[in-house]
A protein has these predicted regions:
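Short, glycine-rich nucleotide/cofactor-binding loops
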Residues: 9-16, 98-102
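Short glycine-rich anion-binding loops that position phosphate/pyrophosphate groups of nucleotides
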Residues: 13, 41, 67-68, 91-94, ...
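Hydrophobic/aromatic beta-strand patches that form the interior of the parallel beta-sheet core
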Residues: 34-36, 62, 87, 119-123, ...
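Glycine- and Gly-Pro-enriched alpha-helical subdomains that act as flexible
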Residues: 122, 134, 148-151
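Electrostatically charged, flexible surface regions
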Residues: 139-185
Length: 185
């Protein structure tokens, strides 16, 4: 890859979510970003696919009347051809453990990109139980954005995607007690 990366950005919380906007702004500092995200909340839809989707222009790119996997397919097929990386998030709520493969729209978008042979990063924000469902602010995603931006800047060149189809990042809320980083396979 020469120059700044081309980034297809999606999520499952919808194109108007604070997490997507925060990631868009952070990633725009290091690359060319095109958002192709659901027009409305599509949380917990897994890898569901639609037979047809409507696509609307949006100030960040495109709003798709469909699932996160639909967004990746539409993006890779027509709206953001040949990106260097697909980023999905920043999700409101962690995506940890094996069960997320079947449920999480955020992780499923990264999996869909991997099926197309495109490196992908799924990014989520851990929320304590009492905050879940209450929404998040733009600023609460700053650590998730920082980690994801770092990975987009550096991971593509390291060869990590020769061994991993996608990365699943889960960041704490700002101000939470730091925990040790764990890399799992």
């Amino acid at each position: 890859m020469d120059g700044s990366p081309s980034i297809l950005l999606t999520n499952d919380d919808g194109i108007e979510s604070a997490g997507l906007r925060a990631l868009y702004d952070g990633l725009a500092e290091v690359g060319s970003v095109t958002a192709v995200a659901p027009a409305s909340d599509q949380s917990a839809v897994g890898r569901s696919m639609s037979t047809e989707v409507a696509v609307h222009e949006h100030e960040l790119g495109y709003a798709v009347e469909g699932t996160p996997s639909d967004c990746v397919v539409a993006g890779l097929d027509a709206l953001c051809a040949d990106p260097d990386v697909v980023v999905s998030g920043s999700n409101e709520g962690a995506n940890l453990g094996m069960y997320v493969l079947g449920r999480s729209g955020t992780v499923s978008a990264a999996v869909e990109a991997a099926y197309f042979g495109v490196p992908a990063i799924a990014t989520s924000l851990f929320l304590p139980q009492e905050k879940f469902g209450a929404g998040t602010s733009y600023d609460e995603h700053r650590d998730a954005v920082r980690a994801t931006t770092y990975l987009v800047e550096h991971a593509l060149e390291t060869g990590v995607f020769d061994d991993a189809d996608y990365l699943n990042v889960n960041a704490p809320l700002p101000g939470d007690t730091p925990a040790q980083m764990a890399i799992t396979t």
